Amino acid sequence: MKKIKEAEQRKIRRKKRIKDKIGRGIATRPRITIFKSNRYFYAQVIDDSKGHTVASISTIEKSLNLSKNIDDIKKLGEVLAKRLKEKNINNLIFDRNGYKYHGLIASFATSLREFGINI
């Protein structure tokens, strides 16, 4: 039980440290935030000045029919990059939401970069 609490505390500290560094998203450079559940992967692009979600994507979308593995997360990044290009958004602030930058998070970010989104 103690190890679980310590892991949660570390995640909370990482999350606070990240928020302090990246600041808030604006209309010209919105913030992309990530959430991972045990089954699904979610990403949403947020304009913090208005408090609106500009674009979002997840593995739960039936039209995409994707699972939570690295290959499908790369496809998810590709689809989100296309959606952002349609809305003329090329620059983002990447908020990894306290998750370590490896595995799914890293592959999602590199996928966005490969398709022309500056993070």
Swiss-Prot record:
It holds the Pfam family Ribosomal_L18p. NCBIfam families: L18_bact. It comes from Borreliella afzelii (strain PKo). Belongs to the universal ribosomal protein uL18 family. One of its GO terms (molecular function) is structural constituent of ribosome. This is Large ribosomal subunit protein uL18. Keywords: Ribonucleoprotein, Ribosomal protein, RNA-binding, rRNA-binding. This is one of the proteins that bind and probably mediate the attachment of the 5S RNA into the large ribosomal subunit, where it forms part of the central protuberance. HAMAP family: Ribosomal_uL18_B. InterPro entries: Ribosomal_uL18_bac-type, Ribosomal_uL18_bac/euk. GO terms for cellular component: cytosolic large ribosomal subunit. Part of the 50S ribosomal subunit; part of the 5S rRNA/L5/L18/L25 subcomplex. Contacts the 5S and 23S rRNAs. The keyword Transcription regulation does not apply. GO terms for biological process: translation.
